[in-house]
Amino acid sequence: DVASLVLAMLAFRLQKVHPNSRYTYGYKKSTILVSLLNAVILLVAVGIIIAESIDKLFHPVSVDGSAIAWTAGVGVVINALTAWLFMKDKDKDLNVKGAYLHMAADALVSVGVVASGIIITYTGWSIIDPIIGLGIAVVIIVSTWGLLHDSLRLSLDGVPVGIDAQKIQQIIMEQPGVENCHHLHIWALSTTETALTAHIVIDNITQLEEVKQHIKEALEEAGIHHAT
């Protein structure tokens, strides 16, 4: 979890580094790479949880339910509070979503451990521990799948979620003076910035700057702040 938060913070810092002759867009895409890495790490963690849970199903181990419940209870509070800090912006930035899911997943695991600890304390059913573990693994997989899908999409320069390429082309075509729009490309510079390039034919070259300004203003309203 600490590594996940450090990676997210590092990506935020790199995103603000100015472009140079070798990296003409700067290091903005580091936020996408980190969100993808966080998704992969979460899935690896799920694999470990599943493997350990299956092993416990076939090789039950007696545990002190009371001790693990109290210990995990502390984890619930810490992880839940940390996840809450990221909750507000998790739908606006994949990098934030990755960090949020890490902390939320840990909070969920801790809740599961507390629940199994209490049940074991009062019933002695040690088998409940791996069963809850498998249930938690399923929940994490479902919640992480969207992060993995969106991160892969942005890594491959796909059109960001929430942006409709056909609608964007229509917006451009509706601007005064525009006759045609082709070779339209839309991709993510980072988890918060979207770029666009297009060949646009206008009916009067003397109005070039005016038409460009209208198009850029319309695109900014549509969530695209870097257009050429």
Give the predicted meaning of each segment:
Residues S4-T228:
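Alpha-helical transmembrane segments and adjacent TM-loop junctions that form the membrane-embedded core
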